């Protein structure tokens, strides 16, 4: 009889090998993830200035000049974009060039939790794109991967088995690691990661065991305590949850200031989301009755339509129903279902990282759809901080 344990271990290693090879091929010869450079037109859009103004600024003292590539095209690293934004603020005083939160003005750390009952909702894709968008915009971002499948972690080029192991949120539960020791820098300047691995599955059991041993154990507040140790270093924390309602998800809900629920436009997902919101109501009722009267008092809750095909009339009808029922809780913008996301995913990349070999116009349309969703979510942060919100 074949050893089923050995078979599954072999399958797991084959999957990891494919991930490693994809990263190595795309990033040869470094064999680790690196971020592409950004064209001058992209940089102008990111900074909110005209391309002509950017061309004039590169000749100013201390302004990042970027690098000249084939055809005389100028490009910039993300760190140079951050430096350009700082230069603009120093020379204009315009607060739009100083996006970091201002604790002295009462701007608290925003913890945005992406969560849903159901796998396949596009949750991780939406969460990681949002985290990268915020980094492009100049915020200090921490992405916390709470899913033992570690899909978000893999997108940043880490092998959960060999490079992460137990250095996850799970290690915080017994305080065997300092909070800062769990944070990994990524190839995105301004974006750090608390990675995931299968060790998080054991964290679920650990939290249940501690609660059985001590009924007053604050099992729900462990992530909030971790983030309290790291708060001064970040403006926004993005949490990618596992697709269930276990102990880790409860921690992410307790720590959250904002909630994003990705929902594909299908009746099955619509029904599943109804059960999810019923669960949230029960959790809020229990927490408020036994722990704190203001538990789960989110600054915002938004439903994001994911995997949307505008040409599909059935999907369009479901989206209309959602907006009629949930009104402003549903973002007007949607994460479109595009083959480009799959193409980028093969290389363990997002659309912000991807450099298409084919139709550039198709890529730009897909990227702009993602940007619209991310801008809409950024506006929620600005509202909470009491800042002006651009349309």
What is each PLM-predicted segment?
Residues 1-42, 46, 51-52, 56-391:
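P-loop NTP-binding core
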């Amino acid at each position: 009889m074949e050893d089923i344990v050995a078979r599954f271990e072999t399958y797991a290693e084959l999957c990891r090998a494919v991930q490693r090879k994809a990263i190595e091929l795309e990033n040869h010869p470094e064999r680790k993830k690196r971020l592409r450079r950004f064209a001058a037109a992209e940089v102008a859009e990111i900074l909110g200035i005209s391309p002509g103004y950017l061309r004039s600024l590169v000749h100013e003292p201390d302004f990042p000049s970027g690098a000249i590539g084939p055809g005389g095209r100028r490009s910039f690293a993300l760190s140079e974009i951050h430096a350009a934004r700082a230069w603009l603020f120093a020379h204009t005083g315009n607060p739009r060039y100083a996006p970091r939160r201002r604790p002295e003005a009462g701007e608290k750390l925003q913890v945005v939790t992406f969560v849903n009952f159901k796998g396949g909702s596009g949750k991780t894709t939406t969460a990681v794109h949002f985290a990268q968008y915020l980094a492009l915009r100049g915020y200090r971002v921490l992405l916390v991967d709470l899913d033992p499948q570690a899909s978000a972690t893999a997108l940043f080029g880490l092998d959960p088995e060999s490079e992460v192991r137990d250095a996850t949120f799970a290690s915080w539960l017994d305080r065997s690691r300092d909070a800062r020791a769990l944070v990994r820098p990524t190839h995105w300047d301004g974006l750090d990661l608390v990675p995931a691995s299968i060790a998080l599955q054991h964290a679920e059991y650990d939290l249940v065991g501690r609660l059985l041993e001590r009924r007053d154990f604050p099992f729900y507040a462990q992530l909030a305590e971790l983030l309290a140790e790291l708060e001064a270093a970040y403006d926004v924390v993005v949490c990618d949850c596992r697709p269930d309602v276990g102990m880790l998800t409860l921690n992410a809900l307790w720590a959250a200031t904002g909630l994003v629920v990705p929902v594909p436009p299908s009746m099955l997902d619509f029904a599943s989301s109804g059960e999810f919101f019923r669960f949230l109501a029960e959790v809020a009722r229990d927490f408020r009755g036994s722990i704190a009267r203001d538990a789960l008092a989110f600054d915002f809750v938004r439903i994001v339509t994911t995997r949307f095909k505008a040409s599909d009339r059935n999907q369009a009808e479901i989206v209309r129903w959602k907006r009629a029922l949930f009104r402003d809780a549903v973002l007007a913008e949607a994460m479109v279902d595009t083959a480009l996301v799959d193409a980028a995913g093969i290389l363990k990349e997002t659309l912000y990282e991807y450099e298409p070999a084919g139709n550039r116009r198709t890529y730009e349309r897909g990227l702009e759809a993602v940007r619209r969703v991310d801008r809409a979510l950024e506006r929620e942060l600005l509202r909470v901080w009491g800042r002006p919100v651009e349309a």
